[in-house]
Amino acid sequence: MDDNKKKALAAALGQIERQFGKGAVMRMGDQDRQAIPAISTGSLGLDIALGIGGLPKGRIVEIYGPESSGKTTLTLSVIAQAQKAGATCAFVDAEHALDPEYAGKLGVNVDDLLVSQPDTGEQALEITDMLVRSNAVDVIIVDSVAALVPKAEIEGEMGDMHVGLQARLMSQALRKITGNIKNANCLVIFINQIRMKIGVMFGSPETTTGGNALKFYASVRLDIRRTGAVKEGDEVVGSETRVKVVKNKVASPFRQAEFQILYGKGIYLNGEMIDLGVLHGFVEKSGAWYAYEGTKIGQGKANSAKFLADNPEVAAKLEKQLRDKLLSPAVIADSKASAVKETEDDLADADI
């Protein structure tokens, strides 16, 4: 760049800073680039499929799928993982269907969970915005977009037509809260339902509710489906689940993860680790027996998973080996740096 252009750019930057404040425009090379902080989903395979070890903080995420596919279970699992790391979480229950007992079984600390059951869609989104702007909440779940009913529709007659009202509401709300979410470094997850488009001859007839705004504003979109049943004898004890990363602005999209959701227990993490361990050579399988680092840990997947549940230090070691191998070096380095920082903060607090 020649001297005249440099002077003109410096003058423009100076004027922008005086008018809009310091940091309104900056060079990307002025600061060290850091990996995007993430919150685990509770599924190791899904964390790896997302590419950064979980769902990104400071972003909007959409999770959609058919009924009884595990949407709410997945979000409650995210809350449980976030609470383990000391995060503050909120659940905006527009469907008025949250079961505290079930949430507790999945590992959620229901005593510390903030819950709102709003009357209208406007109220739900306003509460979400206020929680984000407080800078004190780390994870917010909105369940669900389909239940965000505009006030005009609630106060109107049953047969009244309200064309595009919900889509306009979502578009306006997302324009307003997106910037606040980034500044607060808060993860906001919208659960959505599926509808069928009429008269579609080619391609998928499926679409999500609430218009197109959420599709654009979401950094990550997850399509969750139930693919089969988990049985113990003749009794169905859970469901086989597949999650596809349909959109991903923070890593490569279109990856898939498959795991089991056990009724009353949630995501079957130990069983998932056994499967991934065998696939990537950390766990040896000989006939029905499984061995880890030369030691037999169980006959059959269920017994091997029980061994991991009874020996959390072995489970933690296997999980670390899988994450180190399957996640990018930048993500691992950033997680180690944050762990070191937390240790230093704890030591500083102890000194005080």
Curated annotation (Swiss-Prot):
GO molecular function terms noted in the UniProt entry: ATP binding; ATP hydrolysis activity; ATP-dependent DNA damage sensor activity; damaged DNA binding; single-stranded DNA binding
Binding site for ATP: 65-72
Primary location: cytoplasm
BP GO terms, sorted: DNA recombination; DNA repair; SOS response
SUPFAM superfamilies hit by this protein: P-loop containing nucleoside triphosphate hydrolases (SSF52540), RecA protein, C-terminal domain (SSF54752)
Alphabetically ordered keywords of this record: ATP-binding, Cytoplasm, DNA damage, DNA recombination, DNA repair, DNA-binding, Nucleotide-binding, SOS response
GO cellular component: cytosol
Keyword check for ATP-binding: yes
Highest taxon in the source lineage: Bacteria
Subcellular location as annotated: Cytoplasm
Database matches in NCBIfam families: tigrfam_recA
Purpose: Can catalyze the hydrolysis of ATP in the presence of single-stranded DNA, the ATP-dependent uptake of single-stranded DNA by duplex DNA, and the ATP-dependent hybridization of homologous single-stranded DNAs. It interacts with LexA causing its activation and leading to its autocatalytic cleavage.
Family statement: Belongs to the RecA family.
Protein name: Protein RecA
Native species: Pseudomonas fluorescens (strain Pf0-1)
Gene encoding the protein: recA
